[in-house]
Amino acid sequence: MDAMKYNDLRDFLTLLEQQGELKRITLPVDPHLEITEIADRTLRAGGPALLFENPKGYSMPVLCNLFGTPKRVAMGMGQEDVSALREVGKLLAFLKEPEPPKGFRDLFDKLPQFKQVLNMPTKRLRGAPCQQKIVSGDDVDLNRIPIMTCWPEDAAPLITWGLTVTRGPHKERQNLGIYRQQLIGKNKLIMRWLSHRGGALDYQEWCAAHPGERFPVSVALGADPATILGAVTPVPDTLSEYAFAGLLRGTKTEVVKCISNDLEVPASAEIVLEGYIEQGETAPEGPYGDHTGYYNEVDSFPVFTVTHITQREDAIYHSTYTGRPPDEPAVLGVALNEVFVPILQKQFPEIVDFYLPPEGCSYRLAVVTIKKQYAGHAKRVMMGVWSFLRQFMYTKFVIVCDDDVNARDWNDVIWAITTRMDPARDTVLVENTPIDYLDFASPVSGLGSKMGLDATNKWPGETQREWGRPIKKDPDVVAHIDAIWDELAIFNNGKSA
């Protein structure tokens, strides 16, 4: 993979500006609702990243819509365009289950992958840009950061792109995760992480191992894009997000130890929040407008107390909004879709394509096309999608089609469903499965059903009827009409000869 070189977020913004992918907004704009409205209109039009240089009431600029197009996601992952993200997926598939070289020629072919692994270790710095300014104790005031309020009925300002860094008591490597954080005081945020997410698991293990002790947490804002995207990519459990970011960037990820704890944060981050979670301290979070297009219900989550704020000189606050697709998470889903395909194909070689339509909230519905090889094959693939990667444990609907269907064309998919499916025979319903906490359609919070649709041609054993033969054109006739098509002038005002 030929990486697009950048060292930090500011380098990346310079790169975007050179390519016409960044717009500076000098007009004063309010972080309360107004930035969301502008960013939403811009994203829906496929517009640039936005740097609001004069947010009303604040001296700190706000960066929004950074990953508002698949192209910018690809650029953030070191690639020129979205199609190149298949190579990222192939690398992840290799790292997930590396195969030893079969001989000298195979070793030579795999050499680029082995060389990339050299960029995996982090580089620890003693001093770092993210610690150029340090605020602690009573001077900590999160209200000085232009935290956005995105929707009219949101409970409070919300940090959306915080890269939360944690470490469990029995783990060597840290976990990086993106969890939203509600502002509830000058030094307090609500850490909304679901119980199965890495940060929450680290916290649960800490509470069991160290009853009553404070759990150290740090949150990086404005890290370099490779590190941010590493936190939302299906990285193998044996690989740290920092290591993966190094692979994407082509250089080792630079980190620095926090001022108040032993966690390591991206050295070039714009802002770092350091602090702790007091065991048992929780607060009601929400409601907030979410990526589903609805306000979610209120629930209790741990409170994150901020003891230190470190930042760069002239720091930039990186933010986003979530709402009914398309939004930034939906765009990320479109780009990361290309990363998923090679990973799935490594486990299931019969998969031809895999598509997560953004209008399905990026993960709730999947369309898979396969080279079908036996009766019941489609059902095996459904079960594989639901179980192989944890990213798809919340996928409610899986549609499986043959490889003559374009998974990304609804006309094709609907045709396959309506001509190759019997609703009773070809629908799989699975009850009492993990479901997204935000899915209010499920009968119980976090627990619901899944549906698989087998829209493949049926094999012997799956049907007793003679199966339909698809209509195919005569290639000789097609070639002849191609040759005389322009002469026919059907779509021209002139008359045919």
Curated annotation (Swiss-Prot):
Requires phospholipid, a metal ion, dithiothreitol and at least one other so far unidentified soluble cofactor for maximal activity. Inhibited by EDTA. Binds 1 prenylated FMN per subunit. Its EC number is 4.1.1.98. It is found in: Cell membrane. Prenylated FMN binds at residues 178-180, 192-194, 197-198. Its main location: membrane. Mn(2+) binds at residues 175, 241. The active site is at 290 (proton acceptor). It is an enzyme of class 4 (lyase). Pathway: Cofactor biosynthesis; ubiquinone biosynthesis. Keywords: Cell membrane, Decarboxylase, Flavoprotein, FMN, Lyase, Manganese, Membrane, Metal-binding, Ubiquinone biosynthesis. It is a peripheral membrane protein. InterPro entries: UbiD, UbiD-like_C, UbiD-like_N, UbiD_bacteria, UbiD_Rift_dom. PANTHER family: 3-OCTAPRENYL-4-HYDROXYBENZOATE CARBOXY-LYASE-RELATED (PTHR30108), FERULIC ACID DECARBOXYLASE 1 (PTHR30108:SF17). Belongs to the UbiD family. Homohexamer. Catalyzes the decarboxylation of 3-octaprenyl-4-hydroxy benzoate to 2-octaprenylphenol, an intermediate step in ubiquinone biosynthesis. This is 3-octaprenyl-4-hydroxybenzoate carboxy-lyase. It comes from Escherichia coli (strain K12). The lineage of its organism: Bacteria, Pseudomonadati, Pseudomonadota, Gammaproteobacteria, Enterobacterales.
